[in-house]
Amino acid sequence: MRVYVLNGPNLGRLGTRQPEVYGTTTYADLVELCQQTGRELGLEVVIRQTDAEQELLGWLHEAADLGACVVLNPAAWSHYSIAVRDACALLRAPLVEVHLSNIHAREEFRHHSVVSAVATGVICGLGVDGYRLALHHLAARAR
């Protein structure tokens, strides 16, 4: 089963951007974690990161066309991008929204995600373990 792991703006800066909020794991470490977890679960993991909303929309459309599951960390786009929300609504397979930090324990403007309403589930505040949990959930659903 193919699973897209898609990451939005600034996630390529993991490890150096606000480590007190996002931890010290680098983006390269996150990629390896997702690939390793995918191998253990028999998943084909396609992992991507972008700072360009248009690019993320294209990847979501690709996943929708293929009927692929998605693990999505929309980052800042969670809070205001109706375009990302609408692209997620096109998905025919499960979508798990992931956030490294607990968005409900941060600034007020981060408390609401427009994506959550169309997600199968949401994992937040568990750091990079959230990605591992999302992949395990999708693998279990496929059985």
UniProtKB/Swiss-Prot annotation:
Record-linked NCBIfam families: aroQ (TIGR01088), PRK05395.1-2 (NF003805), PRK05395.1-3 (NF003806), PRK05395.1-4 (NF003807)
Annotated InterPro entries: DHquinase_II, DHquinase_II_CS, DHquinase_II_sf
Annotated protein name in UniProt: 3-dehydroquinate dehydratase
Source lineage: Bacteria, Bacillati, Actinomycetota, Actinomycetes, Micromonosporales
EC category: lyase
Gene: aroQ
PROSITE patterns, per the entry: DEHYDROQUINASE_II (PS01029)
Residues that hold substrate according to the record: N73, H79, D86, L100, S101, R110
Marked site (Transition state stabilizer) residue numbers: R17
Assembly behavior: Homododecamer.
GO molecular function: 3-dehydroquinate dehydratase activity
Pfam families given in the database record: DHquinase_II
Pathway assigned to this chain's UniProt record: Metabolic intermediate biosynthesis; chorismate biosynthesis; chorismate from D-erythrose 4-phosphate and phosphoenolpyruvate: step 3/7
